[in-house]
Amino acid sequence: MAFDGVVIANIVYDMNRLLTGGRIYKIYQPEADELLLVVKNNKETYRLLISAGASLPLIYFTTKTKANPMTAPNFCMLLRKYISNGRIIEITQPGMERIVEITIEHLNELGDTCRKKMVIEIMGKHSNIIFIDEKNMIIDSIKHISNQVSSVREVLPGRTYIAPPGKGKISLNDLSVEWMENTLLVKPVSVQKAVYGSISGISPVLANE
C-alpha cells in the first residue's frame, strides 16, 4: 500500500475517532526512529506506533509489544517530561499532505494549562517526528537536520518549525469541475501522470487506479 495523503487521511480519521480526548499513558522509543504512544480513552487502551524510518515510515495501531532499551533515549525522556498524562485535543492533516499533527494539552511546572504539538512527517528518507510549542518553536525532534544536511530547512531545537516545501499541487479538498476541465484535462500527458503531478495526496499507484 502506498502511504500517500489519501491513506493518511483515513488513518487520521481513525486516530481522531479513537484517541481524541484520551490521555497519553505511556511513551516508549523502541528504536532510534520509532515511538510508541499508549493512550487511554473511553475505558480502552490504544497503542499507536509511529516510525520515521527512512525505508518504511509508518503510523498505525498495534497490539504487539517490542523490547525497549534499558535507558530511554533523550527524545523519549523529553516527551515523557512534557506530555505524560497529557490529553489529546485534536489530530489533523494539513491539506492532503503526508503530515499528521497531534495537539496535546498538559500542565506545566506551575500547574498552568499548555499545549504542544507532535508533527509527524511521513516522507520517505525525510520522515521525522518533531515536537513543537505553542509558538511553533521546535523543542526537539527524533532526527536533527542541520543546514549541512539540508539547505532547504533546518530541524533543530530552538528553530522555528517550517513545514516541508509544497510542490504547487492542488488539494483534493479544493478540486472543482472547472479546474479539471481547464487544467487537468488539457495537460499533454497521460491522465495518470496529470493526476499525480497536479493533485496533492495522490501517489502514482492511486493515480493509476
Please report, for each region that a protein language model flagged, where it lies by residue.
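A structured, charge-rich N-terminal accessory region that forms the first stable segment of a protein
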Residues: 3-67, 71
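Phosphate/anion-contacting hairpin/loop surfaces
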Residues: 42-209
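Short N-terminal secondary-structure initiator segments
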Residues: 1-6, 151-155
